[in-house]
Amino acid sequence: MHDLWPATAICHYPGGCEKYISNCYQCPMLKRNPFFDLAASVFKEKGKIGLSKITFVGCSRWIMEEAQKGNWLRTACFTSIPNPIDVTAFKRMEKQVARKRFGLPEDKFLLLFAAAKLSDTRKGAIFLIEACEKLKEKYQDRIEIVLMGNSSEELISQFPFKVNTL
């Protein structure tokens, strides 16, 4: 689990709402319908699922513990497998420090596009190029592109802005 949707009626993150702990109803995220309570209906249907053969796997101890609070999941089996990202190596840093470290300009808007193979049509580079064409006149000297992944000169040449590769 990467969010709390399995434990709630419809929310991925319930915010301050704790109705899922007892019974989801009249969800503050939904427009009210006086004739039908979608949250209550979905929560009731989720409660009918047999939990004996399901193990919920959370990506953190926190998400697992929050999901266990859910009314209909209290008897379910839970475990967590933390994300395999080294948070000491990958952490937030000041924007200017990061830009300097990667040789990126400090005075430009940067559009990042990342994929293992940037030219893979499923990744949508053509849509980014089209969007850049629309931005070109208004932001000619204020935008640069940052590409992360395997790219080609053919792809890079299609961008109307300066391209930085990492």
Residue ranges and their predicted role:
Residues A9-P14, K19-Y20, G70, K91-E94, ...:
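Short aromatic-enriched loop/helix-cap "lid" or pocket-rim segments at secondary-structure transitions
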Residues T8, N33-K95:
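A short, active-site helix/loop in glycosyltransferases that binds the activated sugar's phosphate group
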Residues Y139-L166:
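Nucleotide-activated donor-binding/catalytic signature segment of Leloir-type glycosyltransferases, i.e.
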Residues M1-G47:
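Acceptor-binding helix/loop patch of EC 2.4 sugar-transfer enzymes
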Residues C59, I81-P84, F113-K117, M148-G149, ...:
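Short hydrophobic "strand-cap" motifs at the C-terminus of beta-strands
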Residues M93-L110:
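Nucleotide-sugar donor-binding and catalytic loop/hinge architecture
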Residues N71-R74, L104, K134-R142:
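Short helix-capping segments at alpha-helix termini
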Residues P105-K123, I129-E133:
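Conserved donor-binding/catalytic core segment of Leloir-type glycosyltransferases
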